[in-house]
UniProtKB/Swiss-Prot annotation:
It comes from the Bacteria. The chain crosses the membrane at residues 10-30. It is a single-pass membrane protein. PANTHER family: POTASSIUM-TRANSPORTING ATPASE C CHAIN (PTHR30042), POTASSIUM-TRANSPORTING ATPASE KDPC SUBUNIT (PTHR30042:SF2). Part of the high-affinity ATP-driven potassium transport (or Kdp) system, which catalyzes the hydrolysis of ATP coupled with the electrogenic transport of potassium into the cytoplasm. This subunit acts as a catalytic chaperone that increases the ATP-binding affinity of the ATP-hydrolyzing subunit KdpB by the formation of a transient KdpB/KdpC/ATP ternary complex. It is found in: Cell inner membrane. Belongs to the KdpC family. This is Potassium-transporting ATPase KdpC subunit. The lineage of its organism: Bacteria, Pseudomonadati, Bacteroidota, Bacteroidia, Bacteroidales. GO terms for cellular component: plasma membrane. GO terms for molecular function: ATP binding; P-type potassium transmembrane transporter activity. Keywords: ATP-binding, Cell inner membrane, Cell membrane, Ion transport, Membrane, Nucleotide-binding, Potassium, Potassium transport, Transmembrane, Transmembrane helix, Transport. Its main location: membrane. The system is composed of three essential subunits: KdpA, KdpB and KdpC.
Length: 191
């Protein structure tokens, strides 16, 4: 009986610790040391809030760069953040990826099938990725330039400026925030 009571006490202590104290410590750390004090990085255009830089969103128009596909609810639904949990040998998953490749190639007819970046046709684990690799941005430059009536080199320069380097030059990889990139294009248009 003593062992059972000890087990219950330890379980309760750990439940309180991990469900209250630990979360509180993480929240306080984010408030002190986190980017934007642990809050969303709100992005505005012409004084209007258009999104959060740290949560992906869907762009489907030809004049915008597109992010990764999302399996989070009805597309980039932060309340349903999750991957599809389908493995690479799942026939349903393979069919989804093939359909995404076909769709991507329809909008990028200048690409060969082998040149489609894998991240542009596969969803991330969270389903909320706001960033793509520079390669994924560069393969879209021609489409975006044509849709906007801009010079390809001009759009490429916007992408070049949008590339974020790894933290301290060693942590992570180069990335491009899709929302910030599209905002930069809109601001360029408004000049």
């Amino acid at each position: 009986m003593k062992t059972l009571l000890k087990s219950i006490k330890i379980t309760l202590v750990f439940c309180v610790f991990f469900s209250v104290f630990y979360i509180l410590v993480l929240w306080l750390f984010a408030q002190v040391a986190g980017p934007n004090r642990g809050n969303a990085e709100v992005v505005t255009l012409n004084g209007k809030v258009v999104g959060a830089a740290n949560v992906g969103q869907t762009f489907t128009e030809e004049k915008y760069f597109w992010g990764r596909p999302s399996c989070a609810g009805d597309g980039y639904d932060a309340t349903s953040s999750a991957g599809s949990n389908k493995g690479p040998t799942n026939p349903e998953y393979l069919a989804e990826v093939e359909a995404r490749i076909d769709t991507f190639l329809i909008h990028h007819p200048y690409l060969a099938r082998k040149d489609v970046p894998a991240e542009m046709v596969t969803a991330s684990a969270s389903g909320l990725d706001p960033d793509i690799t520079p390669q994924s941005a560069y393969v879209q430059v021609k489409r975006v330039a044509q849709a906007r009536g801009m010079n390809v080199e001009e759009v490429r320069r916007v992408v070049d400026k949008a590339v974020e380097k790894p933290l301290l030059g060693i942590f992570g990889t180069e990335k491009v925030n899709v929302l910030k990139l599209n905002i930069a294009l809109e601001e360029l248009k408004n000049r």
